[in-house]
Structures are given as structure tokens and as C-alpha cells.
């Protein structure tokens, strides 16, 4: 038996808690509904970092900007030991302990699928397009989710590699990245203290699609320039609102 409980959220969102007899933990999240009454909105699923929860920036900012499209819904859920299902001491320390479980990725992908399918069923939505945004821990879970049977159209990922803080799951990430065939924007920090450059590039190179791009900036893990977030939003908007998006190449650009 499955149930969903609703409550007022933050930043204009509605919080929800999904419980079921076959779940070992509740699924907690937030939904920003489209301002239009369309039953075929685009959806963007948003994953947060290990130190945050479903409302970690830039998720509320992204929801506000993409919400201007009127027929776009934003769905964010808490990580496995985060937010409304926090496990002490919380944050990265709790997450790194969670990573010791051999099934932690599959359980989180399951949570994402249940949350998405429950929400679209509750509101009788038939999404037209499906996108994903998730950096750092949001990429650790995002890449396996993007490789699942959900039909994603585009995604923004990054702040993650196949080594460093993700070394325990590096091979899994590389294998799943090789299944991703839709457009990808990848964010990289050149002095990232959690992920080395080699692991970053190995993960980016493993992504199957040819329609991918990487933006690299100097700075530590959390020092992503604001303009990269704006680029991420525009990237998602482009692929969510246009039926056919092709990359134009100027060739040759110089002689």
C-alpha cells in the first residue's frame, strides 16, 4: 500500500512524503507545479549535493527561472540521508557512510522513479519532455538515473568524476555514462578538492552522446561561477522547448 502526504513547502513549492509497505524509508521531496493548466508539461528532475537537501541552491533559482515557461514542472527529492530523512550527523559525513552500502545507488534510482511516477499519476500529467539537473552527489545518482528506462531528453551534470570522492562507484558511473545518448552539459571545477581532473575527463569521455559539452572553470568544488548556472538553465530551456535542436558548426573557423 502506498500513500502520499502533502504540505506547504518553501520557495513556492509543495512538499510531499511518499510511504509504502515495500519501501525501507519514506521518499521526501518538493514539486513546483507549472503555472499553466497543461496536462502535458515538461518536467525537470533536480538532484542536490551531499551537503544539502531538496532546497539547496541553485534548485530554487532554477525552479523560478524555468517556471517562467509556464508549462514546466520542477521535481526535487531529498538524498538518501538528507532533508526530511536526515541521518545524523548529516551532510557529507552521513552520505559517505551511506556509500558503503552496495545498493545505495539502486535504492536512490528507485526513489526517483517512484517519486516521478507518483507525481505524474497524482496530477494526471503526461509529460512532453523530461530533463535532469544535478551536480556533485546529484551526478552520482543522476548518471544511473539517466541510464535507466526513463526517457530523458537532456541533462545538466558535473562536479563529479570517476575517481576521488566517487572512487567506490567509479566503474558503475563509467558503465552507466556509456548508456546516455541525449544532450549533456557538464560542469567542471579545475581545482576541485574532491575530484581530480583525470576522473572528471574520464567520466565526460564515457558519456555516449556526441551532443555533449564541458565548461571548466578555475576554483574549488563549490566555486561554480553564477554564469554557468544561467547557462545550465538556458541549455535545459533550449532542449525542453524546441522539437529539434541541432548544433551548428562553423567549419573551418580559421585558415
PLM regions: where:
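N-terminal cap/lid segment of alpha/beta-hydrolase-fold proteins
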Residues: 1-39
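Primarily recognizes the serine-hydrolase "nucleophile elbow" in alpha/beta-hydrolase
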Residues: 110-179
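Short beta-strand element of the alpha/beta-hydrolase
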Residues: 39-49
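Alpha/beta-hydrolase active-site loop
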Residues: 90, 94-123
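Short beta-strand/loop motif that positions the catalytic acidic residue
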Residues: 180, 186-188
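Short alpha-helix in the alpha/beta-hydrolase fold that links the catalytic acid
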Residues: 59-60, 145, 169-173, 182, ...
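Short amphipathic alpha-helix adjacent to the substrate-entry channel of hydrolases
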Residues: 56-77
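C-terminal catalytic histidine-bearing segment of alpha/beta-hydrolase fold enzymes
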Residues: 202, 209-255
